[in-house]
């Protein structure tokens, strides 16, 4: 096996976590920019109706892509565990089983998106003037879903062994292509929402091709060999046991957010458009923080597999500190630069004013989510996924739905709607931390030497 294992199991943790997380954060940002460039281009060159149409799909896009990201988190943890423990055969079986599972998941989600887009958008109470464009955007965008699934698979494998630079490089190429195609399809071809969706789908295919090609050229046990593609029952079960709860958590979050989107849609079209523009900040800030969550799971899993309990707990606290700091700093920057940020997506002053109502509530709340999400990642790094998912479903998702139908229904204001985010994050974080403390104590018991007789 390669000496690259030392990237995660040796050396100063604070420095190593930062160096691994930085390319991950940039990769996450580029993925967000895929959709942001769609919104910016249609808002600038296709009008506010097209902007609202694309923005109305954001929750559904998050639902499906969130499931794939959760699945890839399971792949990341399992490969890291076996790689840290120096079990090359298990790494090989996991990689090839994961490739098959990811491809199948991408195709299934593609079919669901193509067939179910109209019904799901109507369920969200999407405005009638926005509905045709939103349906077109979703159906074309989902053509790239299998490619997105395979890219996330490749990203998870490389990240699990500490190589986060390759995914960043490939996504940079695809991101530049995405922006160029957006401008070409919308300005030159006048394709509006179809053009930006097509640009995203093509770019996702390019990033998937590049990362899969790189995996086939690796000289290590995590290499992808098309001739070895076979579903190993034991590894497939482990991947699904880790990845499906994480994927369902992301999907359930998105489902809960559907109710929030329905609440936004209960206001006039101006507020819907302002919310669509302001919501782009969520992806930028949250995904920068999420890089440290993936690093946390990778470092904890590899060090746990390598028998380094001293580094396991430190990985959690360092990752938590980084993610909280990033959320706080970026949230403050958004608050003070909000109008300029919103102007990237619309030139209408009224839409910018509407968007600032959301920004004023959310800007200083992002950092709170680090205590919830980093703790969930830490539990997954120890192989625990079911209970953290149940806690999230109850503490955040169910709580949010109840909030929408009680607190928001009573006050019916934008602040009353968006205050549910920090409140649900605090509630869930407390429960997740209590569970992690318990399972950490049990997991570390295997490293304690028995007392002398």
Task: Map each language-model feature to its residues.
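N-terminal transmembrane alpha-helices
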Residues: 8-45, 59-74, 78, 103-110, ...
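Transmembrane helical elements of multi-pass membrane transporters/channels
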Residues: 19-38, 140, 151, 174, ...
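Small-residue hotspots at the loop-to-helix junctions and early N-terminal turns
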Residues: 46-59, 134, 138, 197, ...
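Short runs within selected transmembrane alpha-helices of multi-pass transporters and secretion channels
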Residues: 72, 141-159, 167-175, 196-211, ...
């Amino acid at each position: 096996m390669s000496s690259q294992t030392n990237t995660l199991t040796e050396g100063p943790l604070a420095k190593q976590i930062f160096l691994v997380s930085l390319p991950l954060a940039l990769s996450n940002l580029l993925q967000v920019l895929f959709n942001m460039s769609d919104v910016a281009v249609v808002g600038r060159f296709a009008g506010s109706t097209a902007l609202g149409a694309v923005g109305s799909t954001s929750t559904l896009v998050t639902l499906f892509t969130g499931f794939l990201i959760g699945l890839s988190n399971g792949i990341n943890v399992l490969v890291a565990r076996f790689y840290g423990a120096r079990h090359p055969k298990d790494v090989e079986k996991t990689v090839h089983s994961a490739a098959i599972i990811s491809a199948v998941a991408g195709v299934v989600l593609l079919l669901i998106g193509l067939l179910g887009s109209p019904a799901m958008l109507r369920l969200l109470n999407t405005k009638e003037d926005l509905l045709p464009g939103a349906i077109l955007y979703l159906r074309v965008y989902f053509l790239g879903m299998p490619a997105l699934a395979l890219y996330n698979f490749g990203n998870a494998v490389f990240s699990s062994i500490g190589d986060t630079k390759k995914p960043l490089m490939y996504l940079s190429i695809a991101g530049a292509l995405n922006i160029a195609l957006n401008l070409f399809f919308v300005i030159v071809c006048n394709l509006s929402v179809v053009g930006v969706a097509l640009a995203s789908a093509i770019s996702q295919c390019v990033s998937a091709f590049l990362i899969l090609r790189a995996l086939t050229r690796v000289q290590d046990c995590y290499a992808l060999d098309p001739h070895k593609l076979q579903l190993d029952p034991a590894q497939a079960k482990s991947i699904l046991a880790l990845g499906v709860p994480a994927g369902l958590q992301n999907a359930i979050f998105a489902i809960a957010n559907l109710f929030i989107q329905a609440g936004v849609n209960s206001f006039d079209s101006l507020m819907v458009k302002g919310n669509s523009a302001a919501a782009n900040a969520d992806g930028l800030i949250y995904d920068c923080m999420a890089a440290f969550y993936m690093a946390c799971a990778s470092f904890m899993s590899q060090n746990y597999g390598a028998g380094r309990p001293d580094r396991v707990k430190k990985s959690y606290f360092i990752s938590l500190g980084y993610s909280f700091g990033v959320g706080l700093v970026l949230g403050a920057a958004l608050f003070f630069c909000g109008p300029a940020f919103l102007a990237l997506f619309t030139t209408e002053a009224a839409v910018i004013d509407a968007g600032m109502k959301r920004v004023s509530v959310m800007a200083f709340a992002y950092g709170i989510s680090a205590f919830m999400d980093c703790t969930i990642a830490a539990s997954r790094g120890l192989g625990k996924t079911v209970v953290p998912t149940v806690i999230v479903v109850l503490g955040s998702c169910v709580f949010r739905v109840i909030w929408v139908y009680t607190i928001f229904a009573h006050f019916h204001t934008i602040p009353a709607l968006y205050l549910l985010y920090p409140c649900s994050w605090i509630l869930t974080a407390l429960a997740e931390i209590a569970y992690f403390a318990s399972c950490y104590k049990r997991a570390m018991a295997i490293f304690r030497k028995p007392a002398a007789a």
